[in-house]
């Protein structure tokens, strides 16, 4: 297998990971629903290219955080199938990181969309 084939195969694994995240994680569904709603709002209000860049970065940040959180939770479950306080802390901290990203994205959404909403 040459280098190009290896790279293509690694992208395939990455896309499988995204599909697993979206198929199996309830919170990822919620984030995807928010992405759809924000995208529709962006088209409706005609946000600027810069604003599209900002909200797209937020989409990626939140979904990536959810992916990291899911991977961490599954790894913790694998190595510590029985309850352990440190394992619980690790999972809580990872979930908290997702919440931080989601709150930041929400604040950015307010900053971007509030002027449009006030001008309706």
Q: What residue spans do the PLM features occupy?
A:
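Hydrophobic alpha-helical transmembrane segments
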Residues: 2-71, 79, 83-86, 95-120
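Short basic (Lys/Arg) and small-residue
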Residues: 90
């Amino acid at each position: 297998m040459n280098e190009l084939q290896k790279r293509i195969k690694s992208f395939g694994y990455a896309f499988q990971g995204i599909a697993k995240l979206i198929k199996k994680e309830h919170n990822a569904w919620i984030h995807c629903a928010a992405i759809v709603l924000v995208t529709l709002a962006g088209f409706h209000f005609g946000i600027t290219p810069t604003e599209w860049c900002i909200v797209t970065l937020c989409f990626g940040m939140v979904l990536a955080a959810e992916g990291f959180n899911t991977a961490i939770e599954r790894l913790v479950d694998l190595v510590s199938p029985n309850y352990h306080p440190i394992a619980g802390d690790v999972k809580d901290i990872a979930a908290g990181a997702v919440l931080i990203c989601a709150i930041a994205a929400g604040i950015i959404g307010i900053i971007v969309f509030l002027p449009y909403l006030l001008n309706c």
